[in-house]
Amino acid sequence: MRLDRLTNKFQLALADAQSLALGHDNQFIEPLHLMSALLNQEGGSIRPLLTSAGINAGQLRTAIDQALSRLPQVEGTGGDVQPSSELVRVLNLCDKLAQKRGDNFISSELFVLAALESRGTLTDLLKSAGATTANITQAIEQMRGGESVNDQGAEDQRQALKKYTVDLTERAEQGKLDPVIGRDEEIRRTIQVLQRRTKNNPVLIGEPGVGKTAIVEGLAQRIINGEVPEGLKGRRVLALDMGALVAGAKYRGEFEERLKGVLNDLAKQEGNVILFIDELHTMVGAGKADGAMDAGNMLKPALARGELHCVGATTLDEYRQYIEKDAALERRFQKVFVAEPSVEDTIAILRGLKERYELHHHVQITDPAIVAAATLSHRYIADRQLPDKAIDLIDEAASSIRMQIDSKPEELDRLDRRIIQLKLEQQALMKESDEASKKRLDMLNEELDDKERQYSELEEEWKAEKASLSGTQTIKAELEQAKIAIEQARRVGDLARMSELQYGKIPELEKQLEAATQSEGKTMRLLRNKVTDAEIAEVLARWTGIPVSRMLEGEREKLLRMEQELHSRVIGQNEAVEAVSNAIRRSRAGLSDPNRPIGSFLFLGPTGVGKTELCKALANFMFDSDDAMVRIDMSEFMEKHSVSRLVGAPPGYVGYEEGGYLTEAVRRRPYSVILLDEVEKAHPDVFNILLQVLDDGRLTDGQGRTVDFRNTVVIMTSNLGSDLIQERFGELDYGRMKEMVLGVVSQNFRPEFINRIDEVVVFHPLGEQHIASIAQIQLQRLYKRLEERGYEIHISDEALKLLSANGYDPVYGARPLKRAIQQQIENPLAQQILSGELVPGKVIRLEANDDRIVAVQ
């Protein structure tokens, strides 16, 4: 008999049998070796065949292993093994059986039949396991489905549905799928398309995270519960596992062979199976090589004839990119659009999923947490869809609470560290013999005993709280199982079991759960097991950097004293500081318009009066860092073509993938201060882009993504009208001067731009009285730098007056002051430090000497 007439699986099993004989030091390859190899073969036909015939494959394997251990062993054969006469006889019988059946190749299941018709140890073992020629023949017919073996890979294609699909209806029966709430319209539309005679293939299209896969799971659950039309009752929903289908397909045509096997198996089911292909676009081009047919083209004939009931799911972009290009494939599918659910629908979905997440995380999820997750995620996470982003918030908040339950409470941890510290000190003091050390040791022992007592009490309490939590968890798990059992009993019509569960077990468990929850609520001191809206806000703040959590007392006071904080850096300019402070307070109190930026301001005034400094102070106040603002120098955007740098290059241009300078910065930090410095120097087209930002708090970048500016403070600075401010300052009141400056501004900016700004703030020129305060602030920075090098410095009032007089220029504001400090203080100090006149550790005094400032120690 030619070995190349065996199927691939049979050839592999024969090679494994040879290895087995070598390993056992047997001289001959017996039918037992081959049967053992076939039973252990991954993805082979023998185990499913025996199971189908009602034979316990595990027991048979044990019996064969025992028989193998009794075979005679020969040493010193030098690895020479050959088939025994018995094996040759059985293989010849296989050949004969294959010819009778009209097979071109000999498949491995015929070996079991041939072994039964032969005689020997294997025959006896098979018969004692319950195998007969009749039941094995019947199982073979069932497995083959009336087909003959015409190619070597025939066995690989068998049970393709089992290998390459996941049965969603089976998972729904076992209660492993999450409940699907709402989405009735989409599920009804899907069923409607599936009921058609031809082209009965719906494709679910929607943004990522809106619940396309959940709709198919909902369909599977409805089929199980019998809540579908007659035409769909008893159908199975199988999800195609593309990963398994492609994995390991090494040779050309192997992928197509597997897919063909799946399609053949589906054809045999005669419409009793609905195939679900998640990420449908992956089928287009899958397995495509030079001249080969891709998966999409292989599906077309079956889809068009209505033989294959297929439900696809893909996103809008990928549908357009892959499926719309192939018009022949597109027309075979019927589109079902899945829109993002509203906040109200999302709350209903979350309430339905609540129990599953409570069971998984062993925590309690409150209703305010669910409402907060839906509303906050809708408002603050712009680039993702509901319900996915809301579910993620709940999941992560529950996970963080669970982590706190599992880890040691902070109070215990602090005590533990203190005990370790005291023990180390105790060890050190025990080595000392002086009186002071002994006295300290006695005190330390007392403290140590006290801390250890506290620790053990707290630990007991912690363990008790953990135990009570796990108690409620066990009851919840039992209740969940009882609910699944009642559903299964309802499907099969077991009324006795249903009544036992409904009126006996479930009410009893609910009573136990209520009692356990009440006792739990009384005792909790160290552990929190509830997810509230505060935890949701905390997680959201961690994701986006937007402070949406409830304000602590300290933060409220800080916001009420905001003007004082800003005035510590920005001298004068009361109107500007007040306008900015009010905008931030409105935002944190939740009163600002949710569809516009927190605040948008145009700062006008002469150079050096604190316009940019106020932005830095604001960023520092909000984020504790001057760098936490997006600063864009508008003088860089003077040409028309440079506008695209803000939002990103359009498609087809170099740099398209990189995104825009402004949009990318805000996408990364949605909560920030945006400073557009020297705004009048920018090209007029830049203002057209800013119109959407100021009005709707949004901007579309070069790649079509919408960037959310609703949590930003937009500040623009300009020098327009500064000559008027300089000339008329002191002559006119603030209101009159502001009107005049706005007249100049309206000549440079369009009315629709000025109209969208919350407030135009005119900065005053600085007076001599302001310069002294600014000098103090500037000097503080110098003191800090010197302090790091070990120098302490003080300035006399006369020296400060002299410095202010030298640094004051009504035209240039406070900037000349910086130069004055540099020339009159920093330069002489640097020389004196380098020459060694000034030494670290001693106080340096800055005194006025005529029109100079001198440093003395």
From Swiss-Prot:
Keywords (A to Z) from UniProt: ATP-binding, Chaperone, Coiled coil, Cytoplasm, Nucleotide-binding, Repeat, Stress response
Domain of life: Bacteria
CDD domains in alphabetical order: AAA, RecA-like_ClpB_Hsp104-like
Coiled-coil regions listed in the entry: 391-525
Location within or outside the cell: Cytoplasm
Keyword Protein transport: no
Matches recorded under PANTHER family: ATP-DEPENDENT CLP PROTEASE, HEAT SHOCK PROTEIN 104
The protein's name: Chaperone protein ClpB
Protein source organism: Salmonella typhimurium (strain LT2 / SGSC1412 / ATCC 700720)
Lineage: Bacteria, Pseudomonadati, Pseudomonadota, Gammaproteobacteria, Enterobacterales
